[in-house]
A protein has these predicted regions:
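Beta-strand-dominated extracellular/periplasmic modules and repeats
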Residues: 2-86, 90, 97
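Compositionally biased low-complexity segments at domain edges in trafficked proteins
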Residues: 93-114
Length: 114
């Protein structure tokens, strides 16, 4: 069973980001999205979700971090709304960890091996 995990930190005040909605959707060949899970980070800014899906072939997913819930638009100009990763999974046992450091003006992330 594949697992998606994350740890989200707020670069503006150095805290863990709790209650941030993270949604994983499967992008189907017809362009439609099927939500696999939608969960919130815990008090420590962490989320870990395992899910069941047929991964006999590569599948494309979108992992969305709903940053706009944390930082409502306050200023004129460009603000970071939501962060979306498009990822490919093809292993039933894959663990995919994405740490994210966010602010209202951007984000920094990387894929971390476990």
């Amino acid at each position: 069973m594949p697992t998606i995990s994350s740890h989200v930190l707020n670069s503006e005040n150095g805290t863990h980001v709790s209650d941030l909605t993270i949604t994983l959707s499967h992008l189907k060949e017809d362009g439609k999205k099927e939500v696999i899970f939608s969960s919130k980070t815990d008090k420590g800014g962490r989320l870990s979700e395992s899910f069941t899906i047929d991964l006999s072939e590569d599948k494309i997913f979108e992992l969305e971090f709903k940053i706009s819930d944390l930082f409502p638009k306050k200023e004129k100009g460009i603000n970071c709304n939501d962060l979306i990763f498009r990822i490919s999974l093809n292993s039933r046992e894959e663990k995919f960890h994405i740490p994210v450091i966010i602010s209202r003006h951007g984000a920094s992330t990387w894929r971390s091996g476990e």
